């Protein structure tokens, strides 16, 4: 049998979890809306004839990087505790990819 004190603790714990999930859902919906907006901006940038490719390509890459950050932190839950090891491997991979691209660009354009 559950007494009133433990029942109150269970209810408060349940309320805390509901508020936490509601806050996470709000961030996910906001992030989804921002990603849709960034995608629309990328399409409009390509569709605009007045903007040169020297601006368009780096701008789209920047928008893609921002979307990757939103994907990792809000949809893949990398902002929560317990994801330190996957985050380390992910950031190490990003670092290696950045160095590789930098090396290729340096070799080609130097």
Swiss-Prot record:
The keyword Cell membrane applies. It is found in: Cell membrane. Keywords: Cell membrane, Membrane, Translocase, Transmembrane, Transmembrane helix. One of its GO terms (molecular function) is cytochrome-c oxidase activity. It is a multi-pass membrane protein. Its EC number is 7.1.1.9. Coiled coil: none annotated. The keyword Ubl conjugation does not apply. The chain crosses the membrane at residues 27-47, 50-70, 88-108. GO terms for cellular component: plasma membrane. InterPro entries: Cyt_c_oxidase_su4_bacillaceae (IPR014257), Cyt_c_oxidase_su4_prok (IPR005171). It catalyses: 4 Fe(II)-[cytochrome c] + O2 + 8 H(+)(in) = 4 Fe(III)-[cytochrome c] + 2 H2O + 4 H(+)(out). NCBIfam families: CoxD_Bacillus. Belongs to the cytochrome c oxidase bacterial subunit 4 family. This is Cytochrome c oxidase subunit 4B. It comes from Bacillus subtilis (strain 168).
């Amino acid at each position: 049998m559950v007494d009133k004190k433990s029942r109150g603790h269970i209810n408060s714990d349940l309320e805390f979890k509901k508020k936490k999930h509601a806050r996470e859902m709000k961030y996910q919906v906001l992030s989804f809306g921002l990603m849709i907006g960034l995608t629309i901006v990328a399409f409009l940038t390509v569709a605009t004839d007045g903007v040169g490719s020297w601006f368009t390509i780096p701008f789209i890459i920047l928008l893609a990087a921002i979307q990757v950050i939103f994907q990792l932190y809000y949809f893949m839950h990398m902002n929560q505790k317990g994801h330190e090891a996957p985050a380390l491997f992910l950031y190490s991979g990003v670092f290696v990819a950045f160095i590789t691209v930098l090396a290729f660009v340096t070799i080609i354009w130097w």
